[in-house]
């Protein structure tokens, strides 16, 4: 009998995740594990979605970029006022499906009107941890103080096509625990997100160049270079759609992303979608 594909799916953090591919379960990249989710001493905002009109890889790179705060976010840097401002070296650690980093920033104090009297009152070192998991999960963990004042943010970025992305945003914190603070904190997060969007929507080229020699990467871009190298390794494994071939055939052929059952069963109605192959 003729068959159509179906895919493994599950719910986590209030988000439905579906694995689109034919890998067996023990070889897949699972959804990132948020260790503090539902843990004592932590509070999660309601998950929100953000639709952006640019490529998901560009979006992830922007979130990883340790240099952009000084130029894009007025509350995160000094807006060029410090002539000796510099980006400190990034400490990068490999993971099974990506990389983590640790970064020390020279950062201004937090706004007491927004974050209250417990917010840090002086400029100085601020530690940010983060990284990426798989091709499209961004992790940002901001520690404004040693034991508290922590914001942990997780962005699950769903590619719609080359030029559109839907982001599912999970925001965790271990301070300002009153439910009444949820709206204020998310409003602040969305202001920051739209500062990024205003810059990124005009970035050219829309899609990350195939070669890193086609854009200037500086020492501060080390984690971005690492992310691009990881994506290249995924491409070699056949994890990425060949968009050019797909577009050439889109009016003549309907394709399906292969499901796990294709490895053991036959008689599929639709051809498998074209994938990039190693050079």
Describe the predicted segments one by one:
Residues 1-17:
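Active-site-proximal cofactor/substrate-binding loop regions of enzyme domains
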Residues 24-279:
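C-terminal catalytic domain of Rieske-type non-heme iron oxygenases
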Residues 12, 19-23, 29:
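Short, acidic, small-residue-rich periplasmic hinge/interaction motif at the N-terminus
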Residues 17-19, 42:
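Tryptophan-centered motif/residue detector
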């Amino acid at each position: 009998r003729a068959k159509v594909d179906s895919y493994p799916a599950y719910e986590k953090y209030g988000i439905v995740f579906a694995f689109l591919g034919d890998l067996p379960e023990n070889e897949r990249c699972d959804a990132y594990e948020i260790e503090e989710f539902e843990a004592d001493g932590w509070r999660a905002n309601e998950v929100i979605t953000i639709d952006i009109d640019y490529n998901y890889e560009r979006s992830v790179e922007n979130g990883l970029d340790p240099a952009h705060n000084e130029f894009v976010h007025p509350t995160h840097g000094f807006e060029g006022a410090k002539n000796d401002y510099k980006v400190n070296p990034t400490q990068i650690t490999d993971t099974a499906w990506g990389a983590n980093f640790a970064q020390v920033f020279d950062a201004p104090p937090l706004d007491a009107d927004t974050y209250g009297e417990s917010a840090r009152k002086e400029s100085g070192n601020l530690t940010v941890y983060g990284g990426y998991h798989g091709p499209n999960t961004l992790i940002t963990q901001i520690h404004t103080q040693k034991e508290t004042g922590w914001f942990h943010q997780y962005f699950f970025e769903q590619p719609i096509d080359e030029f559109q992305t839907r982001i599912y945003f999970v925001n965790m914190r271990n301070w300002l625990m009153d439910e009444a603070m949820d709206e204020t904190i998310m409003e602040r997060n969305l202001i920051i997100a739209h500062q990024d969007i205003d810059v990124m929507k005009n970035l050219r080229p829309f899609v990350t160049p195939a070669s890193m020699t086609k854009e200037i990467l500086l020492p501060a871009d080390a984690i971005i270079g690492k992310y691009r190298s990881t994506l290249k390794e995924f491409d070699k494994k056949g994890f990425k759609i060949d968009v050019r071939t797909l577009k050439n055939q889109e009016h003549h052929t309907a394709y399906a992303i292969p499901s796990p059952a294709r490895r053991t069963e036959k008689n599929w109605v639709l051809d498998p979608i074209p994938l990039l192959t190693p050079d």
